[in-house]
Amino acid sequence: MSGKLIVLEGSDGSGKETQARLLASRRQHDGEPTRMVTFPNYAGEASAPVRMYLAGRFGTHPEDVNAYVASTFYAVDRFASYREDWGAFYESGGTVIADRYVTSNMVHQMTKIADAAECERFLAWLDDLEYTKFGLPRPDAVILLDLPQAVTARLIAEREGKDGGDIHERDSAYLRRCQAAYDVLEARYGWRRIPCSTGDRLRSKEDIHAEICRVLADI
């Protein structure tokens, strides 16, 4: 008996990890067997190509590694995590809350493809790769934590002052394309959008969490 998979998606700084932890804790408190997973799984050996890519080892811009190759890096990391860590729990009926998932591959890699027809082929290829060939479970719900691009840019700039950022975070044009991709995919796949700010002011994590719980009441 398969369990449930709920994905928290959104731009950097939108609070995915915080909200995933709050949601997992809430469901555990309610007596539902629940685990949280995070992607990329930087602690796992299979994330090595992802870490090298984000560090700029294969090129200093996201487009230096094409969408198909970069997607494979992330897909292998997810496959290893599923097989070694949370797959048995999920397949026995547990609920898994994921901070990012296949959805992030869709967003971040489709931005590298300008041609609309090729973008459609890429999305179909990625769906087959991760869900069919690698056998990863499809999400029961995707929550899109929505932040205006200007707020995202400010939060990333504040964080970059501490750690320098990765090749995605350092490319503002790339991040703007990702913001547009979120809008396209949310409409196409029925993701559930949660606004995380009012104007340029962030909502409290408690307020956002309460709305997520309301939106997921049927899952």
Residues of each region from the PLM?
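Pre-Walker A (Motif I) flank of P-loop NTPase domains
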Residues: 2-5
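Hydrophobic anchor at the beta1->P-loop junction of P-loop NTPases
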Residues: 8
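P-loop (Walker A) phosphate-binding loop of NTP-binding proteins
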Residues: 11
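Conserved lysine of the Walker
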Residues: 16
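Hydrophobic positions on the alpha1 helix immediately C-terminal to the Walker A/P-loop
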Residues: 19
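NTP-dependent small-molecule kinase module
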Residues: 22-24, 150-219
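ATP-dependent small-molecule kinase phosphotransfer cores
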Residues: 30-134
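A glycine- and Lys/Arg-enriched "phosphate-lid" helix/loop adjacent to the NTP-binding pocket
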Residues: 103-180
